[in-house]
UniProtKB/Swiss-Prot annotation:
Phosphorylated on serine and tyrosine residues. CAV1 promotes phosphorylation on Ser-23 which then targets the complex to the plasma membrane, lipid rafts and caveolae. Phosphorylation on both Tyr-19 and Tyr-27 is required for insulin-induced 'Ser-727' phosphorylation of STAT3 and its activation. Phosphorylation on Tyr-19 is required for insulin-induced phosphorylation of MAPK1 and DNA binding of STAT3. Tyrosine phosphorylation is induced by both EGF and insulin. The keyword DNA damage does not apply. This is Caveolin-2. One of its GO terms (cellular component) is plasma membrane raft. It is a peripheral membrane protein. The lineage of its organism: Eukaryota, Metazoa, Chordata, Craniata, Vertebrata. It comes from the Eukaryota. Its main location: nucleus. Residues 1-86, 108-162 are cytoplasmic. It comes from Dasypus novemcinctus (Nine-banded armadillo). Residues 87-107 dip into the membrane without crossing it. GO terms for biological process: caveola assembly; endoplasmic reticulum organization; insulin receptor signaling pathway; mitochondrion organization; negative regulation of endothelial cell proliferation; positive regulation of dopamine receptor signaling pathway; regulation of cytosolic calcium ion concentration; skeletal muscle fiber development. One of its GO terms (molecular function) is protein kinase binding. The gene is CAV2. Belongs to the caveolin family.
Length: 162
């Protein structure tokens, strides 16, 4: 009573192309979605986000829920993932794209007009600074270090056991 004695063989058949692009959701009107063939991630920046139900929920063989519960939870997972993503993109995509555009424009401007001229100026000045620094070390620091080295080289220590 209430216990399953036979295993039911439940299979979900989804076309690979449709599943990878649409998360298994069947669209009612195919004319509205004619541009889905365009790859919006050609460099595969977000390939790690292609999660399916089996990647998140897994029941070991020893503990299975009822087949209808498994099928309904799979369907609800896919539908809620689809609907929540669409809902969030409606409200967040445009403001976040605007903010990202401002951020990248600012960083590009700073890099082009401040950072690179500063780096090029430093690289242009460095040979003369290197020559001056070598002269300063040869004239002032090298004799000082040589004198200190000679002074300490004449020091000898003897240990005695008393």
């Amino acid at each position: 009573m209430g216990l399953e004695t036979e295993k039911a063989d439940v299979q979900l058949f989804v076309d690979d192309d449709v599943y990878s692009r649409h998360s298994g959701v069947d669209y009612g009107d195919s004319e509205k979605f004619t541009d889905l063939g365009v790859d919006r991630d050609p460099r595969r920046l977000n390939s790690h986000l292609q999660l399916g139900f089996e990647d998140v929920i897994a029941e070991p063989v020893s503990t299975h829920s009822l087949d209808k519960v498994w099928i309904c939870s799979h369907a609800l997972f896919e539908i809620s993932k689809y609907i929540i993503y669409k809902f969030l993109t409606v409200f967040l995509a445009i403001p976040l794209a605007f903010a990202a555009g401002i951020l990248f424009a600012t960083l590009s401007c700073l890099h082009i007009w401040i950072t690179m001229p500063f780096v090029k100026t430093c690289l242009m000045v460095l040979p003369s600074v290197q020559t001056i620094w070598k002269s300063v070390t040869d004239v002032a620091i090298a004799p000082l270090c040589t004198s200190v080295g000679r002074s300490f080289s004449s020091v000898s220590l003897q240990l005695s056991h008393d």
